[in-house]
Structure formats: C-alpha cells, structure tokens
Design a protein with these regions (language model features):
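Catalytic glycan-binding domains that act on GlcNAc-containing polysaccharides
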Residues: 1-139
Length: 139
C-alpha cells in the first residue's frame, strides 16, 4: 500500500476543477489529467510556440468560436472548460475514438506519437486502480 502525498489547497482545487469540467463534458477526468500532463506539465502559464495557452494548451482562436471576448485562457476553470469542450467536440467528430480525437486536439491527426504519450500518462500516472482486496470483494 502506497500513500499518496498530501495535496495543498491549489492541488485540491485543480483536481476538483478537472473532475467537474471533465464530467460536465462527459470525459474521463483521468484522461484529462493525462492530457494536461503532456500538454503543459501542469503549468498554468505555459505558452506553446504556436500560441496555445494554459494547462490544456488552448489556442486563442477558440475564444472567438465558442467563448466570450473577455475569457482568460490562463484562468484554471476557463482553460479547463475550453479544453474539455474542445476534446468532447473532437470525440464526437471521431465517434468516440479517443486516439483520433487526441490527434485532432493536438493538430497531429494521423501521427501516433502524441496520442500515445497522452494514453501512457493517463494509464500509468492517472488511472485509478482498486486495491487487490477491494477488487476481489467486488467493491
């Protein structure tokens, strides 16, 4: 049994916000955490060479398409709302195919590297596993 490290208030707020926005969009919160790990390394003020911003690396053009002009992409909840909405949009386009939706999200559709990185982070770092005793008991 390994005990998880204690989270500070900011860490708890991040996890709660991810859970809220992911479930609101019909996404697995652990998938969203894996995407955030790969996209920004959980850096709030990350900016890519293409101009993508924040935790989920949202491109500013999305503000004009689906948001309001005063939306701030470096705000945690705003960034998560956009990122989760965009990923849901791509999942719908790809009829639930997570691999292809991740490729669209990153702009690398058809290239396996990015979806594989997110999938690995999701499954190795963020996938919840029941302890063996609980799994055997059927809980």
């Amino acid at each position: 049994y390994i005990e998880a490290p204690a989270l500070d208030a900011a860490g708890l707020d991040l996890l709660r916000s991810v859970h809220y926005e992911a479930t609101r969009a019909g996404l697995d919160p652990q998938l969203v955490l894996g995407l955030m790990q790969v996209e920004s390394g959980f850096r709030k003020y990350a900016v890519s060479s293409a101009g993508a911003r924040g935790y989920m690396q949202v491109m500013p053009f999305w503000v004009k398409l689906i948001g309001r002009p005063d939306d701030k992409l470096f705000d945690l909840r705003t960034n998560l709302r956009y990122g989760c909405t965009i990923l849901r949009h791509y999942l719908d386009i790809e009829k639930g195919d997570v691999f292809r939706a991740l490729g669209r999200y990153n702009g690398s559709l058809g290239k396996p590297e990015y979806p594989n990185m997110v999938r690995a982070a999701w499954q190795k770092q963020w996938s919840y596993q029941k302890p063996a005793k609980l799994a055997q008991a059927g809980n």
